[in-house]
Design a protein with these regions (language model features):
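Residue-level signal for the short linker/turn that defines the boundary of a DNA-recognition helix
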Residues: 23-25
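Inter-helix linker motif
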Residues: 138-150
Length: 150
């Protein structure tokens, strides 16, 4: 692919990101838009970098969630901290152990931001429960409905 073609792919990044949001899969997005995986991945990385550069350390998050997502077969996970209000991902860490939760909470939010969180929603994974009480001592801890309904 020539430079001008690649610039066109990046210029139409919104379409790529919108398609990624719908498919939740880089390979499917590449196929649908007739792009290479590398092109889709580059657009995604640029969007993430742009979002991180816009992050405001003074922004307050009243309600946050800790959750995990399987990324491969065989119980390989990433842990995610996100804003419960709008679903914005604040941080992602490899694994779902205590160290992963510590990385999520201390890297994504300042001490002041964590002190102002009012509620933390988790599933029943022990590391998330421990993280909710350790890193958000002023917040109420709750479980989402998905995990409470039997």
């Amino acid at each position: 692919m020539g430079t001008s073609q690649f610039q066109n792919v990046l210029a139409d990044g919104k379409k790529t990101i919108d398609t990624l949001k719908s498919t939740k899969n880089q390979t499917k997005t590449a196929s649908l838009l007739r792009l290479s995986f590398s092109e889709v991945h580059t657009v995604m990385e640029r969007a993430v970098a742009r979002g991180l550069s816009r992050r405001n350390e003074n922004e307050e998050y009243e309600h946050v969630c800790l959750d995990e997502k399987a990324i491969r077969k065989g119980h390989e996970y990433v842990s995610i901290l996100y804003d419960a209000r709008n679903g914005a991902v604040l941080e992602v860490a490899e694994g779902r152990k205590d160290e992963s939760v510590k990385e999520l909470c201390t890297k994504a939010l300042t001490n002041n931001q964590r002190a102002n969180v009012r509620t933390v929603c988790t599933d029943m994974w022990p590391a998330f429960i421990k993280g909710a009480t350790t890193y958000f001592p002023n917040a109420l801890h709750c479980h989402d409905l998905y995990h409470c309904v039997t």
